């Protein structure tokens, strides 16, 4: 979602960028739900996170990009059969960004979506098993330029 908001030298795509920041707000709320001591917070908790996300969306209908963010979550569940808690947790844990240098390659769910997108854009059949996507830091920037 972050790169979807990347424009060129003189523009940005506002809705994906807002969705990215709204996901970040939800993620920080999740860390503080687990443990909060002043400016310190805990780590997101997976069990029930999808339901908490849906509740967050219901209570924050005016948050920037919330409709897109909800659709991204539902797309993964609907089109890829992702288990809802696993999918939302992966995104939340990723945006918190405290697992460096893990993972050593793309996140499990994200890799499936990126793979499908790249194969489709290159004119292939995303349903084939002939492609292995191994993107690392800087890989998306290389694709942009």
Question: What are the residue ranges of the model-derived segments?
Answer:
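Conserved N-terminal helix/loop that builds the PLP phosphate-binding region
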Residues: 1-71
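Conserved core of the PLP fold type I
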Residues: 40-145
